Amino acid sequence: MNIYVANINFRAQEDQLKQLFSEFGEVSSVKIVTDRETGRSRGFGFVEMPNDADAQKAIANLNGKDFHSRSLVVNEARPPKG
């Protein structure tokens, strides 16, 4: 399952996010979206977890959790409209 994660601290690293989600199961990939021109974090990203039950557990436990002094917004990623 692909998980959308918002309100990520701009200094947070992908490996830190992976470690956080790994508490709930296997993480196959983590991507923090960056600005193309500056390379700076845009404050959101995606975590891919192969097991849907683990992903749901991570969403339930991490939505609203404080991570590097910011409250995460975590939910199932939805395909872009269009």
Task: Please annotate each region the language model reported.
Residues 1-42, 48-82:
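Intrinsically disordered, low-complexity RNA-binding regions enriched in Gly/Arg/Ser/Tyr
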